[in-house]
Every structure is written in C-alpha cells, then in structure tokens.
Amino acid sequence: MAFGHRERPAPAGVLTAAETAETAAAIGRVQRTDGGIPWFRGHHLDPWDHVEAAMALDAAGEHDRAEAAYDWLARHQNDDGSWYAAYADDGPATPADRAAETNFCAYPAVGVYHHWLATGDEAFRRRMTPVVTAAVEFVLRFQRPGGELGWRRDPDGTAAPGALLTGSASAHHALRCALALAELAGTPQPDWELAAGRLGHAVRAHPERFLDKSRYSMDWYYPVLAGTVRGAAAHARLAARWDDFVVPGLGVRCVHPNPWVTGGESAELALALWAAGLPRRATEILRCLARLRTDDGMYWTGYVYADDAIWPEERTTWTAGAVLLAAAALTGDHATRTVFSGATLPTGLPPDCC
C-alpha cells in the first residue's frame, strides 16, 4: 500500500445529513438528564468517551447537548483537577474506578476547544478554561523525565508503573489544545509548552519508553490521529502495519491477529488518514462501517468476521461519536478539522536533549 503522496479530496456522501442527524439523535437519547453520556443505557460513563460523544454532538450541530456534557465534567471534577476512571449514575462505578487515568483527565481540553471553535461561545470558554487548567496541572504531575506520561493514579494515590503510547499521544493532543485555550485567555503557560515538547518527542522518537501494546491497532495509528506524527513520517507509520490491521472491505482489527474488526478503531483510523492527507483511504475505511450501523443510527461495537457475528452485542455512544467525527472531518466541519489537523495548534517547545 503506497502512502507517498497527498490525495485529492474525498468523494461526497460519507454520511447523508439525515444519517448524521439520526446518529446524533441516538446519542442524545442515551445522554442522561444531568448531561452525562454513558457508553449505553445502564452502563458506566468514562471521561474520555464522554468527551468523544460530546464532540460528535457539536459536529452534528447539537450544541446545547454538547454544552450540557461539558457542564457535567465541570460539576464532577475532583479538587485536584482529576476525574475518576468511570462513573455510574451517582459516583464512581466501583471502588477500583476511583483511579484517575491521565489521558482521560487531559482529553476534556480537546472537547472544550472544539466546542469553542464550533460555537464561538466566549462565556463557555471563560467558564471552562479553569477546568482545563486544573486538569492539565493534574496530568503533568505524572510526566516522567523522558517526557512520557505515567498512565494512571491508583485509588490509593500511588502512580501505577508504566506509560502507554496511545494515552501519551492523546494527552499530547490535549495539551496542544489546552495551550490554544491559554492563548485565547491571554495566560501564557511556558511550563505546558516545555511539557508538550518533551511529550511529543517521546511519542515520536522513543517507543522503548512505553509499555508494549503493539498488538493493538490504537498504538499504531494514534500518534497520527493525535497530530504528534505528521508528513512523511505519518505515511510511513501507517504503511508499516496496514496489512496487519486493515481487513479489506471490513475495517480495522482492534487486536492483531484476532479476526475482529471494530467500529471505533475503524472510524478513528479514518480520521487519522484524513489528518495525514489521505481522504480517499479514509472514506474507504469509513464506508466499511455500514454493516455495523443499526436502524436507529447507532453502531455495533464490532464484528467477528471469522464467525460472521456481531460481538459484543452493544451499541456504544463512543463508536457512534467516532463515526460522526470522521465524517465531519471528511465533509468539511471547521471545528473538527481544526482540532484534528493540528495545523494551527501550538506545538510546544522542543526538548533540550533526546
């Protein structure tokens, strides 16, 4: 699979306007009255996937619902700037869910900046900037000397060992969005700029600093999706394991070599391909997900093609959200393109050493 050139724009018709509205309405039906967006009715909410779904609502024009989701985050932020790993209706889903994952806590910065780009709502930006600031300060307590982020604080307050490449790439994206918000607020954050430079360098140049999760497709494409790897390096990264993870006509494996393609990973790869200047390939991947679309506009999580079986039998808001965001980028949504192209996001300062 050649990746040596930028492609012409993607063909139209990724999702129709009616299909987009139907999917957004389906996410809205799962959203609770307090603004929280769980995976599906009766299941837990986690902060990262909650933000993914909120961004999808904004991309579909459901700005009031998206704002309610961000207000939920503001109300549930812990005093130290963190959020718990998972929530039931009235608090952490289990005692173990009192852990805090660094990429979960960083990601609201991406959503808040996306919502401001989508709406221009200055009151919202002013209200949410302190929330983002507290979250970033929490996350950066876990940055290691090599630039990578420790992935989790356990419920007893100790830092879990190890760093995750996908999580660090996601947090690098979030840190750049947080810097953009700081610029809008007129509050320079030089420490964040240094942290962003070190974190991006670790993701690009030091895979040995991360736990080996190379079986998972997210570790393959996420540095491109997050904007940490761009240009020829992005094309080379995507080409290197394309045949391991992409199943022609079906989508993207979640885990290699399992015969299981998943909607979330497929849509995220499509978004990464668009960001890398490969919209036709992105469109081809996104169109594979038609088999996972349900009558109400939601998407099944995955398909085991060896058994011709939908599995698991769940329809998650974050899968639907990823599809809407990929479609929004392909069809020209300004906020989504700005956030995921990364072209105008602050880059941080390069580290003094490697």
PLM-predicted stretches and their roles:
Residues A2-H44, A68-C105, A134-G162, A196-G264, ...:
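Extended glycan-interaction surfaces of carbohydrate-active proteins
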Residues N103, A123, R127, T166-A169, ...:
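Residues within HEAT/ARM-like alpha-solenoid scaffolds
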Residues A2-G13, V51-H63, Y107-F124, A169-T187, ...:
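Well-ordered alpha-helical scaffold segments within catalytic/enzyme domains
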Residues A160-R204:
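Loop-centered beta-sheet repeat module
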Residues A88, N103-F138:
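A generic, well-ordered mixed alpha/beta core segment in the N-terminal half of proteins
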Residues R65, F124-R127, V131, D191, ...:
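Alpha-helical positions within canonical tetratricopeptide repeat
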